[in-house]
Amino acid sequence: MLEGAKLMGAGAATIALAGAAIGIGNVFSSLIHSVARNPSLAKQLFGYAILGFALTEAIALFALMMAFLISFVF
């Protein structure tokens, strides 16, 4: 019973990974649209896109860490 609850909790924690993937796609989609509209700002916009990617990926890594903690520690 407890093992099943752990697996369900870990599975629920990994749902955030799908949200992070969608967020990263939105970041780079917005980058492509912005550079297409104003190519002279490409370098500055790329820096902002990398920052957005890093923050979104950090959330995904925290969710993955929680899933591993639920699976293997508790």
Swiss-Prot record:
InterPro entries on file:
ATP_synth_F0_csu, ATP_synth_F0_csu_DDCD_BS, ATP_synth_F0_csu_sf, ATPase_proteolipid_c-like_dom, F/V-ATP_Csub_sf
Quick one: a GO cellular component term?
Answer: mitochondrial membrane
Keywords for the protein's UniProt record, in alphabetical order = ATP-binding, CF(0), Hydrogen ion transport, Ion transport, Lipid-binding, Membrane, Mitochondrion, Nucleotide-binding, Transmembrane, Transmembrane helix, Transport
Swiss-Prot/TrEMBL site (Reversibly protonated during proton transport) positions: E57
Instruction: Tell where it localizes.
Output: Mitochondrion membrane
Q: How does it sit in the membrane?
A: Multi-pass membrane protein
Q: Which PROSITE patterns match?
A: ATPASE_C
Q: Where are the transmembrane segments?
A: 8-28, 50-70
Q: Which Pfam families match?
A: ATP-synt_C
A Gene Ontology biological process in which this protein takes part is: proton motive force-driven ATP synthesis
Q: What is its main location?
A: mitochondrion
A molecular-function term among this protein's GO annotations:
ATP binding
For whether the record's keyword set contains Transmembrane, the answer is yes
Main role?
Answer: This protein is one of the chains of the nonenzymatic membrane component (F0) of mitochondrial ATPase.
Subunit structure of this chain's protein: F-type ATPases have 2 components, CF(1) - the catalytic core - and CF(0) - the membrane proton channel. CF(1) has five subunits: alpha(3), beta(3), gamma(1), delta(1), epsilon(1). CF(0) has three main subunits: a, b and c.
Q: Which PANTHER family does its entry note?
A: ATP SYNTHASE LIPID-BINDING PROTEIN, MITOCHONDRIAL, ATPASE PROTEIN 9
Annotated family: Belongs to the ATPase C chain family.
UniProt name for this protein: ATP synthase subunit 9, mitochondrial
Species of provenance: Nicotiana tabacum (Common tobacco)
Tell me the organism's taxonomic lineage. Answer: Eukaryota, Viridiplantae, Streptophyta, Embryophyta, Tracheophyta
Name of the gene encoding the protein in the UniProt record: ATP9
